[in-house]
From Swiss-Prot:
Belongs to the pterin-4-alpha-carbinolamine dehydratase family. It is an enzyme of class 4 (lyase). This is Putative pterin-4-alpha-carbinolamine dehydratase. InterPro entries: PCD_sf, Pterin_deHydtase. One of its GO terms (biological process) is tetrahydrobiopterin biosynthetic process. It catalyses: (4aS,6R)-4a-hydroxy-L-erythro-5,6,7,8-tetrahydrobiopterin = (6R)-L-erythro-6,7-dihydrobiopterin + H2O. Its EC number is 4.2.1.96. Pfam families: Pterin_4a. HAMAP family: Pterin_4_alpha. It comes from the Bacteria. Keywords: Lyase. GO terms for molecular function: 4-alpha-hydroxytetrahydrobiopterin dehydratase activity.
Amino acid sequence: MTGLDRERIVDGAPALSAEELQAALAGLPGWQLAGDGKSICREWRFKNFKQAAQLANLAAWQAEAAGHHPDIAFGWGHARVSYSTHSAGGVSRNDLIMAARLDAATG
């Protein structure tokens, strides 16, 4: 998935097939298909609330800049980000791009 974080978000991106999604997730360590089968998610653990809030804010700022918004949950010592393309009814390449951007920003 080299360079995925630099790809453009495209309106109307279709949902990926199960095979495409599994292949793509292999290049995004830590990301997995959620139980609903229609979103990808990743969880982080931190030493305090501040770090969890910083990750949540980073994901939110990236989402606003791209116009593609995840579900974000966080609390003391943990954060979870989930991406799905609701208009496509599942995971699109846009979700993978946003996951890669978040990974690139968090190192």
